[in-house]
Regions:
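Long, contiguous binding/interaction regions
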Residues: 1-39, 53-63, 73-75, 81-83, ...
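Anionic-ligand anchoring segments at beta-strand to alpha-helix junctions in alpha/beta enzyme folds, i.e.
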Residues: 66-67
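Short amphipathic alpha-helical segments
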Residues: 44-46
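Post-Walker A helix-loop "phosphate-sensing" segment adjacent to the P-loop in P-loop NTPases
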Residues: 70
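Short hydrophobic/aromatic beta-strand micro-patches
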Residues: 49-51
Length: 139
C-alpha cells in the first residue's frame, strides 16, 4: 500500500474480482467463482476455486494473492490453511474464500459438484473478454 493512499474496504464481489485478476495474471488455470450469498450453509459470500500446475505453483499463487490483497486493501486473511505439499491451500478473507489446488486435488475433491447449487462464473472467460475490450478501446 502506498503512503497516503486511502484504503476502502471492498465488497465481496470487488475483492473476488481483484483476486481473480491476480490469479489469472500469475497463470492460475480454470478459475471459477461461486456466488454463495444467501446460501445458509456458506461460510463466505464468494468462493474462488483455481488450479495451479504444480505444488510450488499453488504455493506461489496463494502467497501472491495474500500479498496483493494486503497491498491494495490493507486486508490480511483470517487464515491460510494447507501448504503446497497438501496440494490444496485455502486463503480465508472472511467474505471471500480462495481455494488453490493442484489438478490432482481438484479432480479428487470435486468442489464444483459440492457447490453445484450456487451460481458460478468462469472467470477466465470474463477476464479474457475484458482484456479484449480494453485492447480494442486503446486502438
Amino acid at each position: 500500500m502506498s503512503e497516503g493512499k486511502e484504503v476502502k474496504k471492498p465488497s465481496a464481489r470487488e475483492l473476488a474480482a481483484f483476486c481473480e485478476k491476480v490469479l489469472d495474471d500469475h497463470k492460475a488455470e480454470n478459475i471459477i467463482r461461486f456466488d454463495m450469498e444467501g446460501l445458509e450453509w456458506a461460510q463466505a459470500d464468494c468462493y474462488i476455486v483455481c488450479t495451479g500446475i504444480s505444488a510450488p505453483h499453488i504455493g506461489a499463487l496463494a502467497e501472491r494473492v495474500v500479498r496483493e490483497v494486503r497491498s491494495e486493501y490493507a486486508l490480511r486473511p483470517s487464515a491460510v490453511d494447507g501448504d503446497p505439499q497438501s496440494k490444496w491451500i485455502i486463503a480465508d478473507f472472511g467474505n471471500v474464500m480462495i481455494h488453490v489446488l493442484t489438478t490432482e486435488a481438484r479432480e479428487r475433491y470435486q468442489l464444483e459438484e459440492l457447490w453445484n447449487d450456487a451460481p458460478k462464473e468462469d472467470c477466465v472467460r470474463r477476464l479474457d473478454e475484458e482484456h479484449r475490450r480494453h485492447e480494442a478501446e486503446k486502438e
